[in-house]
């Protein structure tokens, strides 16, 4: 199963501005889709049921690709959308973090109708990843934006309630992305202080019930692990995190770093997915 990575460009990183593919040994397979509607790609989520890949494009649109890399669904350009990460919700809709509006919005899977704000605009200073837990709660990373605005926490939203509760208070956290682990806990890619040359980069696991820090995943000496971004659990159960020049793997069961599975200079990865 190929590993796909969105490589940033522009203010998000001096990458390739493309959706790149790698084989199971980490060897590059080239660009997965050359469609001109893909520019500075961000969020990336595989829908294994429909065998589609949803991609948030820096061209202010959301796309869905088939297994051959052809765009088969397109919202069309949406002025000011500026999408970040994406995830499917318990209602089946495709949810997207909005950087300008500082909220989360929901599109129908068909991408043929306008989205609806799931949370109020400006709910956080700068959204940095989100995911739905087992009980339908939404966990939203509130991080630091490109100009330094923001805070460093994880907020929780109960179903049918857009009033947040501050779940995580961790002085070592500056979230970049988050995912729900097989055990129901929250795992978060962190770079603290955000943007600093000597930032401490980790993946941190928090209890979904009370937000306490469970454990910290570290690269040790196996990789530089600069500018960590997207997180994804693979079909093998391992936890993967894309970064500036590599994709790292961690054994989630014992917390050990397995090293790099992809090494690619200037990758500046934003998100990753195993597809098809």
Can you annotate each of these PLM segments?
Residues 9-14, 59-61, 101-103, 144-148, ...:
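Short glycine/acidic-enriched loop and turn motifs that connect beta-strands
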Residues 244-276:
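Blade-level signature of beta-propeller repeat domains, shared across WD40, Kelch, NHL, RCC1
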């Amino acid at each position: 199963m190929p590993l796909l990575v969105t490589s940033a460009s522009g203010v998000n990183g001096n990458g390739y501005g493309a959706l790149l593919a790698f084989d199971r040994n980490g060897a590059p397979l080239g660009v997965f889709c050359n469609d001109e509607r893909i520019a500075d790609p961000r969020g990336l989520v595989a829908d294994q049921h429909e065998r589609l890949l949803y991609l948030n494009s820096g061209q202010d649109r959301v796309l869905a690709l088939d297994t051959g890399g052809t765009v088969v669904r397109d919202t069309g350009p949406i002025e000011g959308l500026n999408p970040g990460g994406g995830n499917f919700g318990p209602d089946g809709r495709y949810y997207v973090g909005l950087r300008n509006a500082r909220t989360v919005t929901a599109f129908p899977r068909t991408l043929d109708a306008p989205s609806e704000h799931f949370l109020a605009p400006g709910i956080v200073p700068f959204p940095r990843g989100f995911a739905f837990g087992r009980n339908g709660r939404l966990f939203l990373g509130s991080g630091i934006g490109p100009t330094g605005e923001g805070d460093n926490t994880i907020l929780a939203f109960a179903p049918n309630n857009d009033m947040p509760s501050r779940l995580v208070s961790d002085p070592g956290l500056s979230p970049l992305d988050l995912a729900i682990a097989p055990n129901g806990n929250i795992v978060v890619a962190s770079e603290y202080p955000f943007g600093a040359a000597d930032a401490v980069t980790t993946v941190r696991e928090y209890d979904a019930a009370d937000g306490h820090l469970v454990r910290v995943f570290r690269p040790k000496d196996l990789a530089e692990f600069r500018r960590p971004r997207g997180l994804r659990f693979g079909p093998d159960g391992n936890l993967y995190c894309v970064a500036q020049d590599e994709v790292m793997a961690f054994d989630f069961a014992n917390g050990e770093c397995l090293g790099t599975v992809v090494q690619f200079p200037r990758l500046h990865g934003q998100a990753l997915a195993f597809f098809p």
